[in-house]
């Protein structure tokens, strides 16, 4: 697990609304509403669904539950400290927050976001309810048991948008196979946490996990990487759905005509 605690930084840390007040457009409390408004135009966070969280060292900024994502303000943001969370308490109601908005509830996605931060050292995690993500899980489901646990696609240029893995350098290449595990949905989002963590353990190089008939979680080292990987993945999901309509396979054999360079 990455180590985030810094005693000196904690002593100098602002409190209350000072945690979410800044003129900097790239401050997490300003960036999350801006990103969610963009995601809403893409159909990723329709009807208050989905969410986004950004980690700044030990501090985690989280979009609330039940808010219309295109109308979110910086004052709607929750803030917590990773180091102050009890690892034995993984339920939403057992979390402690440094700053809470007065009229919302904590996001049910919170423990899943924290899994990306603590297990992957991610700087940002995005959860979407993209229709393309849901359709891909349905297409996998239709293939039957044993063939519905991972989405695989290769020989597509957009695959280059993904890193090779947390402990590896460089990005995937055109001829590489991108693999995204699929987990089953649960009635309550926070109950997905253990299954997401199991998928992370089984697929240590993945930057995303699909949730059947629900959506996808995507993370990255920073906001830029999480956002571009989420965009690339949605592109590939849409492409995969259209390929299936045309009877085209997601896994293909394409001759390599030039050397692979890192």
Curated annotation (Swiss-Prot):
Q: Where does substrate bind?
A: 109
Q: What class of enzyme is it?
A: lyase
Q: Cite the EC number.
A: 4.2.1.109
Write down the InterPro entries for this protein, in alphabetical order.
Aldolase_II/adducin_N, Aldolase_II/adducin_N_sf, MethylthioRu-1-P_deHdtase_MtnB, Salvage_MtnB_euk
Q: Give the SMART domains listed for this entry.
A: Aldolase_II (SM01007)
Q: Where does Zn(2+) bind?
A: 127, 129, 214
- Localization per Swiss-Prot or TrEMBL: Cytoplasm
> Main localization of the protein?
cytoplasm
Q: Which residues are connected by disulfide bridges in this protein?
A: none
Establish whether keyword Lipoprotein is in the entry.
no
Q: Which cofactor does it need?
A: Zn(2+)
Which UniProt keyword terms apply here?
A: Amino-acid biosynthesis, Cytoplasm, Lyase, Metal-binding, Methionine biosynthesis, Zinc
| Any Pfam family | Aldolase_II
For this chain, the family text in UniProt reads:
Belongs to the aldolase class II family. MtnB subfamily.
Functional summary from the UniProt entry:
Catalyzes the dehydration of methylthioribulose-1-phosphate (MTRu-1-P) into 2,3-diketo-5-methylthiopentyl-1-phosphate (DK-MTP-1-P).
Recorded protein name is Methylthioribulose-1-phosphate dehydratase
Q: Which organism is it from?
A: Fusarium vanettenii (strain ATCC MYA-4622 / CBS 123669 / FGSC 9596 / NRRL 45880 / 77-13-4) (Fusarium solani subsp. pisi)
